[in-house]
UniProtKB/Swiss-Prot annotation:
This is 2-(3-amino-3-carboxypropyl)histidine synthase subunit 1. [4Fe-4S] cluster binds at residues 106, 209, 344. InterPro entries: DPH1/DPH2, DPH1/DPH2_1, DPH1/DPH2_2, DPH1/DPH2_3. The keyword Cytoplasm applies. Component of the 2-(3-amino-3-carboxypropyl)histidine synthase complex composed of dph1, dph2, dph3 and a NADH-dependent reductase.
Amino acid sequence: MAASSSELEVITAKKPNVKGPRRVANQIPEEILKDSDLNEAIKALPANYNFEIHKTIWRVRQAKAKRVALQLPEGLQMFACVIADIIERFTEADTLVMGDVTYGACCVDDFTARALGADFMVHYGHSCLIPIDSTEGIKMLYVFVDIQIDTAHFLDTLRFNFPPGRSLALVSTIQFVAALQAASAALKPDYEVLVPQCRPLSPGEILGCTSPRLDKHVNAVIYLGDGRFHLESIMIANPDTPAYRYDPYSKVFSREYYDHDAMRATRLKAIESACSAQRWGLILGTLGRQGNPKILEHLESQLKSLGRSFTRVLLSEIFPRKLELLADVDAQQWRYSRLDGRMCIPWISIPIRVWGPGLLIIRITNLNGLHAKPHRRLVSR
């Protein structure tokens, strides 16, 4: 028999205790953003360079840091003392500027920073390649240093040189990624625009050691930036795609070329020159976090399987005269174990033969990979 309505009791079910993702407030306090003294001090830095000073001050205060280590690439070191003065003035921390050469985010040297007593580190000008949770014992902040450019001139230049409907791949360094995204959005109504991505890098960002492979239908790759180091990376990865460079400083647009045949011939010659070598030198890079022990161990196992002996050396940078002192390495065959795919192009300007990991793998297996992408990932961390 069904219960009468007077005997029914309505029970409200409890909401399940499901915790959502933890949210951390990332809003910079108004008292920092509107600090007139701080804003006046920031004017000592170039207006078109975003050093994220407000965020830095907030993060240093939030962490209650006592000593802040600043790491900048050579092109930004001229601003280091100004930034250090601002941090010391508006926080309770003192600062130190790290003097070792910094080629990229793989050079993040949290080990040295900790040894110098720093409990907070700011790395400028590069992507977050080393995760902030990997730097144990020290707080980490990456500042990309976004640089504002004349985007209108860049767009006018591309529209003048390429007819509508063309397929264009846009790439740059991290400093110009924001400008690249703005340009991509403006060009899409008239062009097929591709902003390629190589994770964990940002869309459109390339490194001297890492670039994406593009589809064959891409008519041209446009590099926004100065110099050729990063540009050559994507040219090596895409030998059949015409490459152009727009220099945002000089506003010069140029067609760029790379001698792929000479590069491959050099690689083949280096491989053949080592066929009779019995003892090899393996260098583990100690500049920041460039050296990869897993790659080193992998190469050692490969050499052992071939019955080759080796000498292991730790170096922050390669100095040919120092390597010449180690005469027990046959034919001076050295392998530099670091995260730099460009080392797959052997050095020919010095008497010592220095190889990258990719080229050594080819040498100790077979010649089939001669034309392979020179900066492919061989061994993960």
